[in-house]
């Protein structure tokens, strides 16, 4: 059985049902998957397929965040603050 994450939900249940395609919901969903995979990989360090899946999900989330930052900086900042997502390093 899958445990629910203990961090605060940014999106209410009604919003999840209505806006499952919104960028905020997708980032929230990817973040919960990332946290679940990270805790799994702490126990199973040699699970290379899960590591690859984690990298893929991280890339998808980063592309969505880049899109959101270009379209609406206020929503981007609010979402990253609520989900405790770090700003990407600019090289």
UniProtKB/Swiss-Prot annotation:
The keyword Signal does not apply. The gene is rps15. It is found in: Plastid, Chloroplast. The keyword Hydrolase does not apply. This is Small ribosomal subunit protein uS15c. One of its GO terms (biological process) is translation. SMART domains: Ribosomal_S15. GO terms for cellular component: chloroplast; ribonucleoprotein complex; ribosome. Part of the 30S ribosomal subunit. Belongs to the universal ribosomal protein uS15 family. Signal peptide: none annotated. Keywords: Chloroplast, Plastid, Ribonucleoprotein, Ribosomal protein. Its main location: plastid. It comes from the Eukaryota. GO terms for molecular function: structural constituent of ribosome. SUPFAM superfamilies: S15/NS1 RNA-binding domain.
